[in-house]
Design a protein with these regions (language model features):
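Alpha-helical transmembrane segments of multi-pass membrane transporters/permeases
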Residues: 21-24, 61-66, 81-109, 115-125
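Short membrane-interface helical motifs at transmembrane helix boundaries
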Residues: 36-58, 114-129
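Interhelical loop/hinge segments that connect adjacent transmembrane helices in multipass membrane
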Residues: 115-144, 151-178
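Small-residue-rich midsections of specific transmembrane alpha-helices
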Residues: 1-15, 30, 68-76, 151, ...
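Membrane-interface junctions at transmembrane-helix termini in multi-pass inner-membrane proteins
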Residues: 12-18, 70-94, 160
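Interfacial transmembrane-helix starts/ends
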Residues: 15-32, 176
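Alpha-helical transmembrane segments of multi-pass membrane proteins
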Residues: 1, 35, 39, 53-77, ...
């Protein structure tokens, strides 16, 4: 939803001569849409979460919105890696994200839970009590996913570093229509 088909448009319009122009244009559009959707979910988190029947869990919705926004935003740099035929880097970054997500889920949902409960490594309880609250529950799944997705930024930094926010309605129209 956050990429609204722009990944496909990037492949269609980004040739070797003008890939930078379309990269900036399309990534700018995806960042703007992701920002707007995320802002909507942040501003209306309370009524939306109440409507869903999970009052008091606004943080879940905010983290979910941020995860989806980051997924949308990094889709274009990933498309650029594919266009530039860099499969090893693409695979490395994707696998690093998956591995970090799994490790963080194990850390929060098993390791911290068990230390908090006093099952082992009780000397770590003071530290774990600061970072782990059992009542947060499934929120740790969202948190792990958010942290893992934030790791995309340093892993893809060179693709963000040369990005320049750009919007040209005339150039964007055919991209949007595609």
């Amino acid at each position: 939803l956050y990429t609204f088909g722009m990944e496909t448009s990037f492949f269609r319009f980004a040739s070797r001569d003008n890939s930078k122009q379309y990269y900036n244009l399309i990534l700018s559009a995806v960042i703007a849409v992701s920002g707007a959707f995320t802002l909507f979910f942040v501003l209306f988190a309370t009524p939306l979460i109440n409507l869903l029947g999970y009052p008091g869990r606004e943080s879940y919705l905010v983290m979910l919105a941020l995860v989806v926004a980051l997924d949308g935003i990094v889709a274009i740099p990933f498309a650029r890696l594919r266009l530039e035929r860099k499969p090893r880097r693409f695979a490395f970054v994707r696998m690093a994200n998956i591995l970090l997500n799994v490790l963080l889920n194990v850390f929060f949902l098993l390791f911290c839970r068990d230390i908090h409960a006093g099952k082992y490594l009780t000397f770590l309880q003071p530290v774990v009590h600061v970072i782990y609250k059992p009542e947060f529950g499934v929120g740790y799944v969202f948190l792990a996913n958010l942290i893992a997705n934030l790791a995309f930024i340093p892993l893809l930094w060179d693709l963000f570093r040369d990005f320049r926010f750009r919007f040209d309605a005339a150039a964007f129209r055919p991209v949007w229509l595609y």
